[in-house]
């Protein structure tokens, strides 16, 4: 099994990150708007993106947003994105990315990490439960 290398994402990774997000959402997005948003997020000190590489190829990423929540009176690390390309699933890439984000949040003083995932993503639900997460809330959304 090839070694999994983790590293921070940079503006030079925009195309690779775009491909990962398209895989996650099973959709394509306006590439220019994505580039603008991704580069803005890279400048935000509370946003952290890390990539996973196998044999030099980007195969996964995680996005961590550090936020002070008033209802916790503490910092929380929100996992906003976690995606692994199909060819790299089952190789512990997701677990390594998640462990990185948890340690990053811990080092930043966060009391917990949290995330949401689509109700249809049963494999993701099993993954997060296996990684020690528990289902504790319902999330509601409304298109505007």
From Swiss-Prot:
**What GO terms are given for molecular function?**
N-acetyltransferase activity; protein-lysine-acetyltransferase activity
Give the first-level EC class, as a single word: transferase
- Cofactor(s) in the UniProt record: a divalent metal cation
Q: How is loss of this gene reflected in the phenotype of the organism?
A: Cells lacking this gene have lost the ability to utilize aminomethylphosphonate or (S)-1-aminoethylphosphonate as the sole source of phosphate for growth, but are still able to utilize the other aminoalkylphosphonates 2-aminoethyl- and 3-aminopropylphosphonate, and alkylphosphonates. They are also much more susceptible to the bacteriocidal effect of (S)-1-aminoethylphosphonate, even with phosphate or D-alanine present.
- InterPro entries registered for this protein in UniProt: Acyl_CoA_acyltransferase (IPR016181), Bact_Acetyltransf (IPR050832), GNAT_dom (IPR000182)
Q: Which GO terms describe its biological process?
A: aminophosphonate metabolic process
List cystine links: none
Q: What is its EC number?
A: 2.3.1.280, 2.3.1.-
- Keyword entries, A-Z: Acyltransferase, Transferase
Reaction catalyzed: aminomethylphosphonate + acetyl-CoA = 2-N-acetamidomethylphosphonate + CoA; (S)-1-aminoethylphosphonate + acetyl-CoA = [(1S)-1-acetamidoethyl]phosphonate + CoA; L-lysyl-[protein] + acetyl-CoA = N(6)-acetyl-L-lysyl-[protein] + CoA + H(+)
In this chain the N-acetyltransferase domain maps to 4-144
What does the function comment of this entry state?
Aminoalkylphosphonate N-acetyltransferase which is able to acetylate a range of aminoalkylphosphonic acids, including aminomethylphosphonate, (S)-1-aminoethylphosphonate and 2-aminoethyl- and 3-aminopropylphosphonate, using acetyl-CoA as acetyl donor. Is required for the utilization of aminomethylphosphonate and (S)-1-aminoethylphosphonate as a phosphate source via the C-P lyase pathway. Is also essential for the detoxification of (S)-1-aminoethylphosphonate, a structural analog of D-alanine that has bacteriocidal properties due to inhibition of cell wall synthesis.
Another remark in the UniProt entry says: The sequence shown is that of strains K12 and B.
Indicate the quaternary assembly: Homodimer.
Protein name per Swiss-Prot or TrEMBL? Aminoalkylphosphonate N-acetyltransferase
**Organism name:** Escherichia coli (strain K12)
